[in-house]
């Protein structure tokens, strides 16, 4: 597996909510309010300034994630941190369940067909609502449903490879 101490982007401050320093956040954890379990956070401002934060609290309204940060008590303070990204070390995340993967761990792996044709490497993944989709950059970009065992036959972190049942012409 890759370096456990690399930083993983979990979310971002997107704006203020009300006048008392509440913060609208974007979270890429699942469920999205799980981001509060992985503290302390490394905050990185849009200008590149970094700081540590512990003690953030929040809740999911169903439409958005709302948070409070220690020391942020009014809307002006929130506006000053808009765009700030929230990171944690990879080691802060619990081990995934068998046959489940963190997307970040799949990024960079080479993708091979059953016949041994190299399609490229994993750029990123996204969810289309029905399933996750792996985006592969190679001779051209390919999008393959990350569905086991239909399309994804194996993931081998030691060999840094994913094997898929996919027509290389498609």
From Swiss-Prot:
Which PANTHER family does the UniProt record give? Answer: RIBOSOME MATURATION FACTOR RIMM (PTHR33692:SF1)
Q: Which HAMAP family match?
A: Ribosome_mat_RimM
Q: Name the family the entry cites.
A: Belongs to the RimM family.
Alphabetical list of InterPro entries matching this protein: PRC_barrel-like_sf, PRC_RimM, RimM, RimM_N, RimM_N_sf, Transl_B-barrel_sf
Q: What does this protein do?
A: An accessory protein needed during the final step in the assembly of 30S ribosomal subunit, possibly for assembly of the head region. Essential for efficient processing of 16S rRNA. May be needed both before and after RbfA during the maturation of 16S rRNA. It has affinity for free ribosomal 30S subunits but not for 70S ribosomes.
Protein's GO biological process: ribosomal small subunit biogenesis; rRNA processing
Q: Assembly and partners? A: Binds ribosomal protein uS19.
Is Membrane given among the entry's keywords? no
The cellular component terms of Gene Ontology attached to this UniProt record, alphabetical and capped at eight, are:
cytoplasm; ribosome
Protein name per UniProt: Ribosome maturation factor RimM
Q: What is its main location?
A: cytoplasm
Which keywords fit this entry according to its UniProt record?
A: Chaperone, Cytoplasm, Ribosome biogenesis, rRNA processing
The subcellular localization recorded is: Cytoplasm
Write one Pfam family the protein is assigned to.
PRC_RimM
Molecular function (GO) terms for this protein are: ribosome binding
What the entry says about domains is: The PRC barrel domain binds ribosomal protein uS19.
Q: Where is the PRC barrel domain?
A: 97-170
Q: Which Gene3D superfamilies match?
A: PRC-barrel domain, RimM
Q: Which gene encodes it?
A: rimM
């Amino acid at each position: 597996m890759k370096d456990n101490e690399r930083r993983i982007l979990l979310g971002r401050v997107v704006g203020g909510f009300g006048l008392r320093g509440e913060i609208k956040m974007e979270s890429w954890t699942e469920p999205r309010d799980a981001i509060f379990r992985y503290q302390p956070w490394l905050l990185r401002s849009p200008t590149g300034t970094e700081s540590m934060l512990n003690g953030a609290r929040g809740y999911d309204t169903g439409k958005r994630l709302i948070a409070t940060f220690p020391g942020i008590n009014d809307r002006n303070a929130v506006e000053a941190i808009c765009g700030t990204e929230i990171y944690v070390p990879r080691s802060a995340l619990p081990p995934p369940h068998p046959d489940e993967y963190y997307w970040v761990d799949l990024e960079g792996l080479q993708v091979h067909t059953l016949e041994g044709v190299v399609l490229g490497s994993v750029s990123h993944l996204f969810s289309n609502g029905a399933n996750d989709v792996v985006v592969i950059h190679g001779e051209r970009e390919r999008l393959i449903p990350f569905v086991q065992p239909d399309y994804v036959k194996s993931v081998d972190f030691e060999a840094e490879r994913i094997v898929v049942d996919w027509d290389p012409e498609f």
